Amino acid sequence: MSVSVERFGQGPDLVLLHGWGMNGAVWHGIAQQLAAHYRLHLVDLPGFGNSPLREGSDYSLPWLAEQIAIVLPQKCHLLGWSLGGLVASQLALTQPERLHSLITVASSPCFMARDEWPGIAPKVLTGFNQMLAGDFRQTIERFLAIQAMGSEHARDDIRQLRHWLAERPAPQFAALEAGLGLLADVDLRDELLQLSLPWLRVYGRLDSLVPKASIALLDERYPASHSVVLEKASHAPFISHPQQFVEIVRYFVG
């Protein structure tokens, strides 16, 4: 298993993990601004972009975190968007000594709605699984639309996401299927109570995948962490509000 990483820039090491269905090129819209201050590491998660997934791989969250740990600098700031936020959180729990800080973007320790927990409705994830079996490209298009839903610039956001996605090889079906499984099954709410690293959580108020009702619950659950909500952003705030997003990251990382 070989994890592909695009590296450039100078300064403290900042590793960026993309979300479901995407690849590391999704950060290209803000990469040059960040690279003026940080040594960037844009990772393609296994099965996405230029990181081929071997048949029979155990696509669990601990396994994903282990694969990413292999290509991490000795110590870094780690930023994960959406599903990438789950991977980053797992890494922060299992190898905290490798990280200076954790940043999760439009991510939740528990994506699927459960008793007294707002999240993605189970029927939505079931629907994506069914669509995936029939036409995975159409499924990704649908997911792009949901990610931009609510944004003032939804069409532009989708166009940007589609552009970056097309820069690298299409994702593998096995990774897409397993990734949906992680979004449905993973629940790190209790584990993250023990996290002692500096932790920034960034959200879009209009995000339909990480509903605003969950943000207050997370603020209450993790009082030592910091949260920033972009009022007019949806699930991809670094696409819709790039300048503001870069400023938030720079303020936190330093």
Swiss-Prot record:
Swiss-Prot/TrEMBL catalytic activity: 6-carboxyhexanoyl-[ACP] methyl ester + H2O = 6-carboxyhexanoyl-[ACP] + methanol + H(+)
Record-level Gene Ontology MF annotations: pimelyl-[acyl-carrier protein] methyl ester esterase activity
Cell location: Cytoplasm
Record keywords, A-Z: Biotin biosynthesis, Cytoplasm, Hydrolase, Serine esterase
Protein origin, superkingdom: Bacteria
Domain AB hydrolase-1 residues, every copy: 14-242
Active-site residue numbers: 82, 207, 235
Gene Ontology cellular component list: cytoplasm
Binding residues for substrate: 20, 82-83, 143-147, 235
EC number assigned by the record: 3.1.1.85
Pathway(s) where this gene product acts: Cofactor biosynthesis; biotin biosynthesis
GO BP terms in the entry: biotin biosynthetic process
Membership in a protein family: Belongs to the AB hydrolase superfamily. Carboxylesterase BioH family.
PANTHER family the record matches: HYDROLASE ALPHA/BETA FOLD FAMILY (PTHR43194), PIMELOYL-[ACYL-CARRIER PROTEIN] METHYL ESTER ESTERASE (PTHR43194:SF5)
Subunit structure: Monomer.
Protein name: Pimeloyl-[acyl-carrier protein] methyl ester esterase
Organism name: Aeromonas salmonicida (strain A449)
Highest classification ranks of the organism: Bacteria, Pseudomonadati, Pseudomonadota, Gammaproteobacteria, Aeromonadales
